[in-house]
Amino acid sequence: MFAISVLKELYDSGEPLLFSPRGLHKILCNIRHGCNGNTKNQLDNLLEETIYDYGEDQALKHIITNISVLLIKRCYNINEKFIKDSNTIYNTDVLEFYNVRQIPRIMNKWIRSRSNNKITDIGCHIYDNTKSIIAEAMFFTMKHESIFGSTRKDTITFYKYDGTSLPVEAIHADPYYYPYRYFDDIKCSVLQLWKLGYAFNMFIILPDDEKGLDNLVDNITGDVFSKIMTEQMDYKRLELRMPVFSISQETNFCMPIFNLGCHSMFIDGDFSGISEVSDFQLSGIIQKNIIEVQYDKVKTTKPLNVRCSSFYVNKPFIFIVTDVGNYDTIPILLGIYQGSSK
């Protein structure tokens, strides 16, 4: 299970997290497209065979921006077919640089232009012997979506992993019927916020206590993860309070991917489908993700006097963003909120 394997590599107790399993899968598939021999075999073992439509839906650009680029030193004479396939299949730009000192300027100019300044920069982790970097970036916002019938701003006490607590700004939604299920094997409640822009779902995975994510990450399996996203849940009338927040995170995936068995990519890899120059190597796998879980369309209303169960998202939790109607095991975004202020 690709997403779970990566989550287990990245998880750090008490620390926030945000990455795009779908985006990482895309750029690794893009690299695999130009690999042969053991390098390709190791990527085959890590990646799932499903190929997605990686094109951008212009109608959803107010919610999501997803871009990727492969930056290669000019001396490697990139295969023209690989460039074309990167563009048409994986929606990835292929650019060249002459000197490693150019990389930050080229990368940041590209990311500002392609994201319409929603993302302004990305760390490149360059070295004197950098030969190529593949980077992927995603911006996802819920600010302009009204997914609740009646909401108001609130403040809740959030209980952090380290035993402290802090007040956080929250959304308070009046009672509503949500897809909901309790998973006893991972001791978590799962609530689904659905049809964001009529295109996306968000799943909130809330452990029983503030340290429960340790047990969840240790014990969650691909089967359970798939059930969360694919099985029909019962609808339950709940009064929801959950934090509003923004998370921005950059990740260099070289070590996690190496740890997941793709050693050849970084040691004598066979990239003959990308370049015929034998010493070509992949020097960096970088991702930057930004999510805004905020709501512009908040009404100032008085609470309804309706009795029902409460669902307070007041401890560290996992959130997953998926496509509506495309329930699969490689989410668009997967993150952990730890209670940091907005």
UniProtKB/Swiss-Prot annotation:
Disulfide bond entries: none
Coiled-coil regions listed: none
Record's GO cellular component terms: extracellular space
Keyword terms of this UniProt record: Protease inhibitor, Serine protease inhibitor
Family to which the UniProt record says this protein belongs: Belongs to the serpin family. Poxviruses subfamily.
PANTHER family membership: GH10112P-RELATED, SERINE PROTEASE INHIBITOR, SERPIN
Listed name of the protein: Uncharacterized serpin-like protein FPV204
